[in-house]
Curated annotation (Swiss-Prot):
ATP binds at residues 11, 59, 87, 93, 104, 114. Homotetramer. GO terms for cellular component: cytoplasm. This is Nucleoside diphosphate kinase. Its cofactor is Mg(2+). Belongs to the NDK family. Major role in the synthesis of nucleoside triphosphates other than ATP. The ATP gamma phosphate is transferred to the NDP beta phosphate via a ping-pong mechanism, using a phosphorylated active-site intermediate. SUPFAM superfamilies: Nucleoside diphosphate kinase, NDK. It catalyses: a 2'-deoxyribonucleoside 5'-diphosphate + ATP = a 2'-deoxyribonucleoside 5'-triphosphate + ADP; a ribonucleoside 5'-diphosphate + ATP = a ribonucleoside 5'-triphosphate + ADP. Its main location: cytoplasm. The lineage of its organism: Bacteria, Pseudomonadati, Pseudomonadota, Alphaproteobacteria, Hyphomicrobiales. It comes from Rhodopseudomonas palustris (strain BisB18).
Length: 140
């Protein structure tokens, strides 16, 4: 498999409970490297742009409100097959269906407060990374 990058967000429910270190440990144990990371408070405009694909969905407003409710940690992860590997590490969106050992099984509180976001494809990852990081902020 090729070395690739993916984008990750540790959501407000995770940062509120000081889970950054615990989640980072699971990421690194899976063989992924954190090559960029910063803690930010997402603006409403950033959240609406980031989740624009869901704009017509009934949960869009609630999702945006949640993402601006507290700090998030945005990350760039790197490794072999990083997109799929991180999706495996995250686990199912519904924590009750997530496998043991996954981030969501261990830390998510609900489908909505599911602790993390990860890109769904390499192309999406590139777009998402560019929304939050400049090239010189990514140090591989």
């Amino acid at each position: 498999m090729a070395i690739e990058r993916t984008f990750s967000i540790l959501k407000p429910d995770a940062t509120k409970r000081n889970l950054t270190g615990a989640i980072n440990a699971l990421i690194e144990q899976a063989g992924l490297r954190i090559v960029a990371q910063k803690r930010i408070r997402m603006t409403r405009d950033q959240a609406e742009t980031f989740y624009a694909v869901h704009k017509a969905r009934p949960f869009f407003g609630e999702l945006v409100d949640f993402m601006v409710s507290g700090p998030v940690v945005v990350q760039v992860l790197e490794g072999e097959g990083a997109v799929l590997k991180y999706r495996d590490v995250m686990g199912a969106t519904d924590p009750s269906k997530a496998a043991d050992g996954t981030i969501r099984k261990a830390h998510a509180q609900s489908i909505g407060e599911n602790s993390v976001h990860g890109s769904d494809a390499p192309e999406t990852a590139a777009i998402e990374i560019a929304q939050f990081f400049s090239g010189n902020e990514i140090v591989g």
